[in-house]
Amino acid sequence: MLKKQKIIIIVFVALFVVLTILYFAVIAPLTKDDGEETTEPVETDVGESRTPQNYWLIFPQVEREDIKSIEVHNKYGTYKFYRNKEDKFVIEGFENLAYDQEQFSQLVVSTGFTISQVKVTENPTEEQLKEYGFYDDPAYYILTTKSGTVHKVIIGYKIIAGGGYYAMYEGRKTIYVLEKSLEKVVLAPVVDMVAPLVTAGIKSNEYFNIDNFKIYHHDKLFFAAQNLTSEELKERETTALVASKVTHPGDYTPSNIYDEVRLGLVNYVGDAVVALGLTEENLKEYGLSDPPYTITYNYKDDSYKLIASEPVDGYYYVGTYLFNTIVKVPEEDFKFLSWSLLKWIDNSAFQRSITFVASIKVETPQFTETFRLTHLDKSSNPNLIVKGDLCGVIDGSDEVYNFRQFYKSLLTVQIEGEAPLTDEEKAELIANDKRCILKFTVTTLGGNVTEYGFYRYSTRRCLLTVNGVGQFYVVIDVPRKIAGSAQKVIKGETIDPQEKY
């Protein structure tokens, strides 16, 4: 019996020791009051919230699909993106302007997800507001939701460490710190988000439909060209290099460079947009108040207009009326603006297929003759009869062949360069009949009439005029050869293509 009692006592002692250890090791620390305050949940201002990482959200996150508009004001100006009737975001006042979608997505994130790791202060003093940059027209943005909720956040100075910006929510006296990433969108000029398009809306395989192309130097027309009509195209089908004609400074054929320029203008993109709006202020800043260069053209039913500055540090500044912007363009891409007229004109001054010629009038100081052409057969081997006031009827194969040699001499008129004459000197020269070596006038079956004149101004050169307008010169041998060949036709003499005059 005694032994059994000892065992029970030992068990109770062991249990007491275990319970004592458990009390001091576990329970006592949990109930101990050491005088320290317990941690309470952090209070938030109305409209604020906390993220799972315990960061501040200045206002609840707004997703892209819930945004109605975002207005931004910074040192570069004010702009606004809004959702249009097609449910697409556009820039107010520049609705047809393309913009960088990635940049806009960053704007949505920066303005709709306002996360702040810290609150700098609450109820700031006037001195603190100045210190943190909330005076003197600070930057801000206004985000409006589809439901009509408006959030306005004001941006202050960059924090000393450079990792963010001080910010305040309008109507709330609390200063936060927002992430540095907002400087790339909210604090940047809107032009950084705009695609630097100069032209658009034309398919590259339809560049040849660009028509009524003109270049002005200041307000003076420098070069103009237009597409040939179907009738004109037939007249030049065997000789024309391009399906266009120059209309200024005269009726010439454009060089192949004209097509290259038209192709280059299709959907052209520059380096950067430097200004939105062709305002007087912007035009003055980029040398466009009195634009040195103006380009106009049509494409189907649309009209296009570009203005360009003089090149500055390797760039042109190009104002585009399509997008109402000024774009920085590499000088190399628009070098055609500085080209001389000669580069735009094909050297072959006369390009007509004889098949579509009705008559040729030749005038020299020695004679005047009109050759009237009758085309009996328009197959691949057409027959030709020529009647002249002096030469009579030309219908034999040898005589017709000889006449064709004369016609070939017209096709040899080659422009050599621009005549070094002033407008006054040209006018005086053209008015002097004694200086005219030759004129020939071609009338087509379609009724088009073109007169070519050759006026000697030096021992080796003649001013070439087309319908009375002169710009280029040819060597004097050219009109002499044409006149000599015409005279041989009149006299019935054989033309030697190699003969010099």
Model-assigned labels for residue ranges:
Residues 2-501:
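Soluble, acidic/polar mature domains that operate outside membranes
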